[in-house]
């Protein structure tokens, strides 16, 4: 668990402390930040465990504005390890993966991918154009608030494409971000303590017979 976070904070999408030295104070600062990340990661993902219904037992009562996720069975959770698409197809899995990416400072990757999925379903030319510009300003242009890590050539191509937006404007960038998540964050998610706990089958305890 800790090793996964340590790798994450050194990954290009979420450096921990740029320009930090190697002295005792800086080392102590990095260790403190790493402990904070670990605590934050556990608290975020434990939320899903505490606020999810058991499989086949949806919550009843007043509807909440907040979306309720049905906690998967161990068998369902194990399917996520078979393919990245299996994880993304699960509402619970997607929510947990987003929390994991947030702990790695890479949440913009999944947000961009989801924005592209929504964009491709858009039929209206007017909406297509406005959504294309929003995706560009949010994720693509230099110093965008959620700037994704793609090459300059791809960014330039997108800047040209959005002038006459089509559903394929962001295809190349989406594929690159998908590959980045699949090859980096996804394997670390599968190694996380949270995911391993989901895959564990509950132990059946039997009470000793009275003599």
Swiss-Prot record:
**Which domain of life does the protein's organism represent?**
Eukaryota
Cellular location of this protein? Cell membrane; Cytoplasm; Nucleus, Nucleolus
Which InterPro entries does this entry report, sorted A to Z?
Answer: RGS, RGS2_RGS, RGS_sf, RGS_subdom1/3, RGS_subdomain_2
Coiled coil location: none
Record's SMART domains?
RGS (SM00315)
Provide the function of this protein: Regulates G protein-coupled receptor signaling cascades. Inhibits signal transduction by increasing the GTPase activity of G protein alpha subunits, thereby driving them into their inactive GDP-bound form. It is involved in the negative regulation of the angiotensin-activated signaling pathway. Plays a role in the regulation of blood pressure in response to signaling via G protein-coupled receptors and GNAQ. Plays a role in regulating the constriction and relaxation of vascular smooth muscle. Binds EIF2B5 and blocks its activity, thereby inhibiting the translation of mRNA into protein.
Name of the protein in question: Regulator of G-protein signaling 2
Natural source organism: Bos taurus (Bovine)
């Amino acid at each position: 668990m800790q090793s996964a976070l340590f790798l994450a904070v050194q990954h290009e999408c979420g450096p921990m402390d740029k320009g930090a030295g190697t002295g005792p104070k800086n080392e102590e600062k990095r260790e403190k930040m790493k402990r904070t990340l670990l605590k934050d990661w556990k608290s975020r993902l434990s939320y899903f465990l505490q606020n999810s219904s058991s499989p086949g037992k949806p919550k009843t009562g007043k509807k909440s504005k907040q979306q309720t996720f049905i906690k998967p069975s161990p068998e369902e959770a194990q399917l996520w390890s078979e393919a990245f698409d299996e994880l993304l197809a699960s509402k619970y899995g997607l929510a947990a993966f987003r929390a994991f990416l947030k702990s790695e400072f890479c949440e913009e990757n999944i947000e961009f991918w989801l924005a592209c999925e929504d964009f491709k379903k858009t039929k209206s030319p007017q909406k297509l154009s406005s959504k294309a510009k929003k995706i560009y300003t949010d994720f693509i242009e230099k110093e965008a608030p959620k700037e994704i890590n793609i090459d300059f050539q791809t960014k330039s191509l997108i800047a040209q494409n959005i002038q006459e937006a089509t559903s394929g404007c962001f295809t190349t960038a989406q594929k690159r971000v998908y590959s980045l998540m699949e090859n980096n964050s996804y394997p670390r998610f599968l190694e996380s303590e949270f995911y391993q706990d989901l895959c564990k089958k509950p132990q059946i305890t039997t009470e000793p017979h009275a003599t």
